[in-house]
């Protein structure tokens, strides 16, 4: 059993070019860490549950630091997972060690791309060196990882997409790390995303909604830079098949919480041995 909890509403970053979350959640709000810890304790006692899944779009690092310290201080024996944005501040001091000691066993990252030009175009505010160091620390600590990847972001070339795929498939230590998983999604332009307001900046034009999709919140469009829609579709189909042969995938976001149960089931035996082999 894995129960959902919420530490914050909306997204503290709110700058990603592809994201419509600010359109849905106008104001970002973060809860007091102490109140969230109390939720953990209440739910643990009421439902006899020790596994929790943060539903946040991106957990703020300062919140996590306070939350983890409080969990440890009060000796709350739980395991949890949640979604983070790659941040340099996460790598400061012993913050990742603190997360592990508080029960963090899997972190979900919106990597989107392992190409710096594409990340900059996405307005992610992420440097590849942060990705590398975060992944390395997670593997050493025994924190499993999940990566979201995007195929076909406007202006993206085939070679740039392959940078992301090869980052995973050429990294055997990452592939062998317990509980690692990834999902590749085809880019979808949604209403309210920053790209909608200035499509020319991302090399797209003629945004439209097909009549048969009149209730859709997404757009179809034409590209002027990078791959066209046919090339994107073909590449995407090839890559999801390729990834599916090598990487654990999950069909729905919230099934990622099941990864906690997998790790808990195996951690007494093979997990420790596999971590030793990765060192």
PLM region spans:
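A structural motif corresponding to the C-terminal end of an alpha-helix
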Residues: 46-47, 102, 133-145, 171-177, ...
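Flexible glycine/acidic-rich beta-alpha junction loops that bind and position SAM and/or redox cofactors
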Residues: 62, 117-122, 151-159, 175-232
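Conserved SAM/AdoMet-binding glycine-rich loop
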Residues: 37-145, 151-156
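Acidic/polar loop patches that form or flank catalytic/metal-binding clefts of enzymes
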Residues: 28, 50-52, 79-82, 146, ...
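Canonical Radical SAM [4Fe-4S] cluster-binding loop centered on the CxxxCxxC motif
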Residues: 1-34
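Catalytic cores of alpha/beta
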Residues: 94-96, 155-171, 196
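Structural recognition of alpha->loop->beta junctions
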Residues: 98-106, 163-184, 189
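Radical SAM enzyme core and accessory elements
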Residues: 213-279
